[in-house]
């Protein structure tokens, strides 16, 4: 029992950590303040070895598929968020033990110990925010918010540790709690947690937006205006109707898969957003949303797939994207001699590049709209790029900077050991075999699904049936 103070201090740190996370979440939902557990997790995923991250991703996708836990993208994000919160609360337990240890050695310096503890938490959190880039609230608000939470946490935890010690004055133990004290702290932490969640739910209540569009059942001849135009209407009308149970040809914005390097997508302010285009160009230019939206744009029906999509997986989606051909922007800024690639940087720290030859492809779009409405936040608002013939890992969202460079450029996932070219493999998936709805004329069983091969196209799909 001599080490009972360690368990008690860890429990107090954990419970107060729950309250810290709850209040932090409330600030996120109401005022868009930084959420330290998620940001800490995002920072860790950026500094860990690429091979480790790759193994974790593949394992997670396999478990989600194998256990049938739901949609791969949303379930994976939920797992990431759960891990982020869990590891932060576990860190709270370590914080509690560290404070208790310091107080046991120098109880007369309780004020200084509390101050130093809060300062360390604040400094580490601010360092994380600095590494990721400050959010929409700005540096001053970010620092004040983090400092307030950190010092309040340290003060309350110090007070609880000392209060527990006084309850056992005969043992001079600091940090040991009895059952009643533990229940008091547990109740208070859960109360703060539930109250914060309830208030945060009010702030995050979904509101009807133009981005919440339903899936279009069939693609028509007017769905594209760019080089990847749809077939004539007569050809479309002659198609075999989709088998019952086949996924829609166009994915709704809400159902379009989301894979990125963030626990939460960057919420950029469209009124202040700008994208700088510089480097080896004649005329460096800064673009704002109206500069892109108010110029001639083209629409293309685009299929996108994640490179981590397993055979038969659900990380494939199709949508109508509208944007400005990149080649038009290149003509405006003018490329200098020696420019060989375009380096792209995003608000979340993601980066990728494409060769000048690819950038001149008329199908490459700087996308500002999706499904007839501005890009949803989770899909790259206000600007992302579409590059035909590549997996999603090569297509940055939330773009804030483009630079013409004299080298091959850098790629976030390429530097972590992933494919340099990311050219899609041929994919075919059976969605449905409608055995209970045979064709009334022929008696044949309808079979529905998808086939995709990037820019190579699909000429036909053959189906084998075991007799």
Name every feature range the model reports, one short phrase each.
Residues 36-72:
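Extracytosolic (periplasmic/ER-lumenal) interhelical loops and adjacent juxtamembrane/interface segments
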Residues 59-91:
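Individual transmembrane alpha-helix segments
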